Amino acid sequence: MPIKIPDQLPAAEVLGQENIFVMTESRAVTQNIRPLRVLILNLMPKKIETEIQLMRMLSNSPLQVDVDLLRIDDRESKNTPQAHLENFYHDFEQVRGNNYDGMIITGAPLGLVEFEEVVYWPRIVEIIEWSHQHVTSTLFLCWAVQAALKALYGMEKQTHGEKLSGVYRHHRLDEHEPLLRGFDDEFVAPHSRYAAFDGDLIRAHTDLQIFAESAEAGVYLAATKDCRQVFVTGHPEYDALTLDGEYQRDLAAGLEPVIPVNYYPDNDPTRTPRASWRSHGHLLFSNWLNYYVYQLTSYRVEDIGKVFTYQQNSPSR
């Protein structure tokens, strides 16, 4: 089934050229089924690039998905046309009263910035709290995992001495976890972060279930027991050339970045990298949509908040 997006969104043309099943709003109104409503809080600088990457992941599912885009920083963007933001993005006040089957909060280039110094940190905390009553399941990516661990569990950020960048091997820890259904026992995924996610610390300070880990990159995939918060510390949505773009950008800025590990053929940045994580990336998003969103959400989207209020107030809990 397709992902439903606005008719003029740039991602529609790009994904169509890639033979990915998308449905414009004008066509979707003829469909007589309820699509899943997913809110994407896009914190990445290159918003159009991130939109395309995430919508590519969401489209590979038998479920129809209706996407809303959210921004919380109203400062002028250096990487995204203002007209694009005005045409396709909502601010939080516009969606505050809505319910969503799923929400994705992206990463952000803020790994070395203290939370309190992030201009929109109070709003991030507010949205995470808001999601408890308005979203069935939230997927946090990379920096958003750090933010959620702080907001939900009071965990302070841990950082690496140098940026963790490259494609790392992970092993699954649970053979029966639906999020990993169809995964190989070992799989690779890209990372691009200063954040450190130590399994022992996360186990000591949270009640999260850890489903996949890496000897080099730490925890990769975890979730709350009720499936309502999912934490992915890497970037399974990345294109084959995204890490290369980041490396070349940092190189041009004189930052002397480390070469992303296990990424370039023969570790040679002049050679074109290929994506080795694409199938598992698609599978992760598909499993999340199916098992953590579709299977758990309310039949009527307007009932989502009522269901979770009832569950929280139930004497059996």
UniProtKB/Swiss-Prot annotation:
Site (Important for substrate specificity): 192
Pathway(s) per entry: Amino-acid biosynthesis; L-methionine biosynthesis via de novo pathway; O-succinyl-L-homoserine from L-homoserine: step 1/1
Pfam families: HTS
Name of the protein in question: Homoserine O-succinyltransferase
Chain's gene name: metAS
Keywords: Acyltransferase, Amino-acid biosynthesis, Cytoplasm, Methionine biosynthesis, Transferase
Listed HAMAP family: MetA_acyltransf
Site features described as Important for acyl-CoA specificity, chain residue numbers: 111
CC terms in the record's Gene Ontology section: cytoplasm
CDD domains: GATase1_HTS
Subcellular location: Cytoplasm
Enzyme class at the top of the EC tree: transferase
InterPro entries, per database record: Class_I_gatase-like, HST_MetA, MetA_family
GO molecular function, one term: homoserine O-acetyltransferase activity
Annotated positions binding substrate: 163, 192, 249
Record function comment: Transfers a succinyl group from succinyl-CoA to L-homoserine, forming succinyl-L-homoserine.
Species per Swiss-Prot/TrEMBL record: Aeromonas hydrophila subsp. hydrophila (strain ATCC 7966 / DSM 30187 / BCRC 13018 / CCUG 14551 / JCM 1027 / KCTC 2358 / NCIMB 9240 / NCTC 8049)
Keyword Metal-binding tagged: no
EC number(s) stated in the UniProt entry for this protein: 2.3.1.46
Active-site positions on this chain: 142, 235, 237
